[in-house]
Structures are given as C-alpha cells and as structure tokens.
C-alpha cells in the first residue's frame, strides 16, 4: 500500500528576481531555464524545467546550452496568419544562456 503525499507549492527564484512556482507532491532540487536578452534590452526567463537531483539539473543545463547555442543571434519572428509566413521583427536574441537555480526552502 502506498501513502500519498499531499501536494505543496514549491518556488524557485530566478537571478533576475522572477519567481517560478509549481504545485507538486514530488521533491525537486533545481529549476533550470533559459534566459534571453534581446537587442532592445528586454530580459526574459523561459519556462523552467524542474529537476529532482543535481545530476539531472546538470543534464537539463547541458540540453539548455545546446538550445541556447542555436538561438544566439537569431531574429525574433512572428507568424503572419493572413499571409501564412514568418515576419522578422528587427529584434535579435543577443544573449541566450541556460541557468539552474536551487528550489527555495
């Protein structure tokens, strides 16, 4: 017989102060996310991937770094539904990096 653990709210704070939250009964140690810095000065934190062990957090960081390398320097495009094409916005991803932060106690 298994005992169920009551779901609780966990949080992790990004380096820019944004707080990620999740409601779960599982145990997580880190939140890994991509941080985008755009040519217009905007900084955006992507949706986090939660890891339950430090080695899994490192695995998420490695995958994030691979994604970041492909996105670095690319232009942000929007989908034009009427003409069915992507249109460049003139805004570029100047810096993309993978970040892991510990879950708040």
Regions from the language model: what does each represent?
Residues 2-18, 63-105:
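Short, mixed-charge low-complexity intrinsically disordered segments
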Residues 39-63:
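A short, exposed loop/beta-hairpin motif centered on an aromatic-Gly-Thr core
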Residues 9, 23-27, 31, 54, ...:
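Positively charged, low-complexity intrinsically disordered regions
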Residues 18-48:
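Short aromatic-glycine-(Arg/Gly/Cys) micro-motifs in beta-strand/loop hairpins
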Residues 30-34, 47-53, 91, 98-100:
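Extended low-polarity, hydrophobic cluster-rich segments
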